[in-house]
Amino acid sequence: DLTNYNPDFNRDVFRDKSEDAYFGYFTGKPMHQLIDWIEEDRNFHAEHINRVLSGMFCCSTADKWSSTHGKDPSITHFHEDGLNRRWNSTQENWINIGDEDAEDQIGSVFAVQGIDLNKVGVMIGPDIRVNEDGKLEAVPDNHNNTNNKFSVEEMTDPMNQFEFTLYILNQYYVLLTRGIDGIRL
């Protein structure tokens, strides 16, 4: 089992469809909707610290990140119908950096570990999928962090695939537990 199953968990938290529900999800232009949701709260609660975060995926809507991109705001990594955003410019104290576009940067798991935010939008990408057995599994080819991947040959071992899946699930767990006041996918 990949989770700590609790039969007493109140699953109604996922059924609340009201606008102010703690948990929710968007379909169709998800990056636009997550950013709009974050910005709407920012307009009403200027003191709130809200961010959009992302798994370490690449490919269709996200370009691969490189440490050489650093603080160059002209290099963007996330693209959706004319909306372009970049990864967080630093992993240390990212929430408090003085970058002009800091609130608009997309945070990675490495930038938000141990940090509580008010509202969090989380982009889940093609680095994880539901397999034919209905179970979550990682997709190494769509994961953009070369420091934590097995080689292609090593991924043929089911134990390595399982370990990598746990690693990716743990990254999403970190992202999905940052929001005090709400989370949207």
What residues fall within each predicted segment?
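Conserved helicase/translocase motor-coupling segment
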Residues: 1-136
